[in-house]
Design a protein with these regions (language model features):
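C-terminal motif of bacterial Sec signal peptides marking the signal peptidase cleavage site
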Residues: 12-14
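Bacterial signal peptide processing site
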Residues: 16-18
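Extracellular mucin-like PTS domains
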Residues: 23-54
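Acidic, Gly/Ser/Thr-rich repeat motifs that build Ca2+-stabilized beta-propeller blades
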Residues: 48-226, 284-287, 292-300, 349-387, ...
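Surface-exposed loop and turn segments in beta-propeller and other repeat-based domains
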Residues: 82, 125-139, 187-204, 238, ...
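Beta-propeller blade signature
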Residues: 172-180, 231-247, 310-311
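Short, conserved, GDST-rich strand-edge loop motifs in beta-rich repeat architectures
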Residues: 218-238, 305-306
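Conserved blade-ending motifs and adjacent loop-strand segments that build the rim/top face
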Residues: 279, 390-411
Length: 432
């Protein structure tokens, strides 16, 4: 994401070339928060009035998922999902596959809070507090990504991506919860990867395990205007790329391994971790839990916000292209070998795309199989269906006043909308 006015925006087989480091600081977990509202100090965003907390679920008559396209996309609105909870500077949501039905929310200054996925929940607890290690001095820096190990129930591992200072770095680390159902041990950090950042913006930050069990990491181009260092088209740097690494067998130093089928393994001068490249700032990618497809938005420079389906080894064009048009120069660029977005929009739709999920829940049959995404600046939310070749349906489903910093998903595939100002919302059809 990007700074907009004064608001924080977000937005191998063989030798392994990875960076490791010791834990920089130690910190203790504060007391569990018992008040209905969890507020982290030094908040810069002001809360906005929230609509009445009314939510009702639309359910199916049986346990079978809806059929894709059985109902056309339709207009919706948003309502508070957890009216007793409010958080400042929310940037992501995740859940562990441990049967606990808990949700975990990332707060940009460096805190993760956890709570029951229950509309009537009254309190959240602090799961991890690493504010002493996290730098959020740059408007797009901070604690930006969380992924639970696929075997979290057994090993209690989870992974975070955050910004550090002096020097300016993006850090990927593994932590351990005391037990899978408890708070995290802040002293358990094992740094996996540190990436030097030339500027304070375009940090990416999304991390997620794919259906193949590997960890995918989203990195922006390193920042500033127009990718001045050319990182997007440079395979010798990890910046401007989606990485794919194996973290299941970390050695004592924290070193990961690179899957042998990564596209640039063995290519001279290329980093083997790279899965796809030519990316400006991928703010919130996700895997379709049914098809396994990787959906990724890319925040644009001045003209276009775009959505892509990421595939092995492809070049998504930045900084030759912005969206489907030449960047600088604005015409005559060589587009050979570049992958075009499946959709894009200009400034009439907003200014900073936020990626969501392919909906696989049961509450909203008309949305089943559609990719849901939004815009931080305009508060608009769209849904689209894609048949593997082309878009078959595309609709603006919500026009809100929210600052959409992220989307979330629970264990049942239901989608939440996170507004940076403090509210968590769900999508609702009509008055239901």
């Amino acid at each position: 994401m990007r700074l907009w006015i004064a608001l924080v925006a977000l937005l191998v087989v063989g030798c392994v070339d990875s960076s490791t480091a010791a834990v920089r600081h130690e910190t203790t977990i504060p007391s569990i928060v018992t008040s209905p509202t969890v507020t982290i100090p030094a908040t810069t965003a002001a809360a906005m009035p929230m609509p009445p907390p009314t939510v009702a679920a639309q359910t199916l008559q049986d346990d079978q998922p809806p059929s894709i396209g059985a109902e056309p996309l339709q207009k919706m609105h948003v309502q508070r999902a957890f009216p007793n909870l409010s958080f400042k500077r929310m940037v992501d949501m995740a859940y562990p596959d441990d049967g606990s039905n808990r949700l975990f929310v990332l707060l940009q200054p460096g805190v993760i809070v956890a709570f029951a996925n229950d509309r009537n929940v009254e309190a959240a607890e602090v799961f991890l507090d690493i504010r002493e290690r996290v730098s959020d001095r740059g408007n797009e820096e901070g604690l930006l990504g969380l992924a639970f190990d696929p075997d979290f129930r057994a090993n209690s591992y989870f992974y975070v991506y955050y910004s550090a200072a002096n020097p300016r770095l993006s850090v990927l680390s593994r932590f351990t919860a005391h037990t899978a159902g408890s708070v995290a041990n802040a002293d358990s950090e094992r740094v996996i990867l540190e990436i030097e950042q030339p500027y304070s913006n375009h940090n990416g930050g999304q991390i997620a395990f794919g259906p193949d069990g590997y960890l995918y990491v989203g990195l922006g181009d390193g920042g500033s205007r127009g990718d001045p260092k050319g990182n997007g088209q440079n395979l010798s740097t990890l910046l401007g790329s989606i990485l794919r690494i194996a973290v299941g067998t970390l050695d004592e130093s924290g070193s990961y391994s690179i899957p042998a089928d990564n596209p640039f393994v063995g290519s001279e001068g290329a980093r083997g971790e790279i899965w796809a490249y030519g990316i400006r700032n991928p703010w919130r990618f996700s895997f379709d839990r049914e098809s396994g497809e990787l959906w990724m938005p890319d925040v644009g420079q001045n003209r276009f916000e775009e959505v892509n389906i990421v595939r092995r080894g492809l070049n998504y064009g930045w900084n030759v292209m912005e969206g489907s048009e030449c960047f600088e120069p604005s015409r005559g660029c060589d587009t050979q070998g570049l992958e075009m977005p499946i959709t894009e929009y200009g400034r009439e739709g907003g200014c900073s795309v936020t990626g969501g999920y392919v909906y696989r829940g049961k509450r909203l049959p008309s949305l089943y199989g559609a990719y849901v995404y939004g815009d931080f600046c305009s508060g608009k939310i769209w849904a689209l269906r894609h048949d593997g070749t082309k878009i078959t349906e595309h609709l603006e489903i919500v026009d809100s006043k929210l600052e959409i910093s992220s989307f979330g998903e629970d264990q049942n595939g239901e989608i939440f909308v996170l507004s940076f100002d403090g509210g968590i919302y769900r999508l609702v059809v009509g008055g239901r």
